[in-house]
Amino acid sequence: MNITIPFNHPPIVGTELAYIQQAMASGKLSGDGAFSRLCEQWLEKQTGCQKVLLTPSCTAALEMAAILLDIQAGDEVIMPSYTFVSTANAFVLRGARVVFVDIRSDTMNIDETKIEAAITPKTKAIVVVHYAGVACEMDSIMALADRHRLWVVEDAAQAVMAYYKGRALGSIGHLGCYSFHETKNYTAGGEGGALCINVPNWIERAEIVREKGTNRQQFFRGYADKYRWQELGSSFLLSEIQAAYLYAQLSVAEQINRRRLVVWQRYSQALRPLAERGVAEFCEIPTACQPNGHLFYLKLADESVRSALIRHLAECGILAVFHYVPLHSSPAGKSFGRFVGEDRFTTVESERLLRLPLFFNQTDEQVERVIGAVKEFFLS
């Protein structure tokens, strides 16, 4: 079986090598160099975040968030089960218990109306996941967190350049985490991430945590005569080579964003009749949300139809894939967490969701081939 249209192809804009060569010539490769500063400044301007720090991955950003929130053994952290394992791992590593709640069927995001019932005296934080770059209902979640004096972390791995009521995702919670993995809209050469710090008096501490728990940044700025181990931390810097690759992409981020939205809209327009016939459902975009075209999915009647469509597309040379297996159904999810309330949508919706190819360098001809193959399946 020859796959000629991959599910994903890392974005390439053409200036990456030139920027990497500049970074190599600078003699500064280990991070926090000129390209790191350019990326962080771009993200701060784009999002309005108080401070953005590049990290080796979104996983690392989430782990930094758990340290900054001083997560301790026995604390509870509320999140959706329909997410990537890093969302939970970051907090479990600090000793927390994960409390899963159900998702909304329209957006696949955490159901904001189910959170309050999961809050206990041990609850420390709420982690929201903006699935497919579509925002969670942030106003009600932030109001709930404020009433109960809880922290909110945005897992915005898929949500760079996506907005909620005009506010950049990642800038609304107390902390926000981005991914620049090769599957995301913008990549730092395969792996990468960023932590958005929206509480000003956490910025200095975040720099310490990021530098292995030392005040190295203060030393470089001349605020300390030597740097010392201050507290718990780890090596959370992105290399300057990767920052150079990322800056090439951020420099044309609007172009990448526009192209992905064009592909997303073409899928939506061409496949809308399937929804009208009742054989498939699409992601619904709430009016408060401005998405970024991160991914396009169909929801089929059930898992067997999804499997049949995957096989049909593969026979047409097209790779389409499903997504997360809910964490609460996994061995580690059962060991380190619990599901509160009814699992009305998490499992059943995850079993019928299928993602179609969508990437920046995808040609119009490839898009039309995918559309044609999907339509053919439902006509057969």
Question: Model-found features: residue ranges?
Answer:
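Active-site phosphate-binding strand-loop segment of PLP-dependent enzymes
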Residues: 106-188, 194-201, 355
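Nucleotide-sugar donor-binding loop of glycosyltransferases
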Residues: 75, 81-83, 102-104, 156, ...
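Phosphate-binding glycine-rich loop
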Residues: 29-76, 90-94, 100-102, 167
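PLP-dependent aminotransferase class I/II
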Residues: 37-41, 46-52, 113, 117, ...
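N-terminal "arm"/small-domain region of PLP-dependent enzymes with the aminotransferase-like
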Residues: 1-30, 228-230, 357
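Helix C-cap/helix->beta junction micro-motif
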Residues: 94, 147-148, 316
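Conserved PLP-anchoring active-site segment centered on the Schiff-base-forming lysine
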Residues: 63-119, 125-127, 312
